């Protein structure tokens, strides 16, 4: 195989490689975005639970006469 033929062959693979790399990058970004949304949702739930527990604690700490 002569050098010009190798060059042409590598040029054919290059666009497919770039497309595959772009797909991987896009999938990675989607995964990161989904994980971030899940973390925010979990944080919101945990904050609400913490507030409920704190309110319950405050009620228990109040003297019965108040």
UniProtKB/Swiss-Prot annotation:
Biological processes, Gene Ontology terms: axon development; brain development; negative regulation of endothelial cell migration; negative regulation of protein ubiquitination; protein secretion; proteolysis; regulation of metallopeptidase activity
Family to which the UniProt record says this protein belongs: Belongs to the SVBP family.
InterPro entries noted in UniProt: SVBP (IPR031378)
Lineage: Eukaryota, Metazoa, Chordata, Craniata, Vertebrata
Annotated protein name in UniProt: Small vasohibin-binding protein
Subcellular location per the Swiss-Prot or TrEMBL entry: Cytoplasm; Secreted; Cytoplasm, Cytoskeleton
Function description: Enhances the tyrosine carboxypeptidase activity of VASH1 and VASH2, thereby promoting the removal of the C-terminal tyrosine residue of alpha-tubulin. Also required to enhance the solubility and secretion of VASH1 and VASH2. Plays a role in axon and excitatory synapse formation.
Tissue expression profile of the protein: Highly expressed in bone marrow, spleen and testis.
Keywords, comma-separated and alphabetical: Coiled coil, Cytoplasm, Cytoskeleton, Secreted
UniProt-recorded Gene Ontology molecular function terms: microtubule binding; peptidase activator activity
The keyword Secreted is assigned to this record: yes
PANTHER family (alphabetical): SMALL VASOHIBIN-BINDING PROTEIN (PTHR34762:SF1)
Cellular component aspect of the GO annotation: apical part of cell; cytoplasm; cytoskeleton; extracellular region
Subunit record text: Interacts with VASH1 and VASH2.
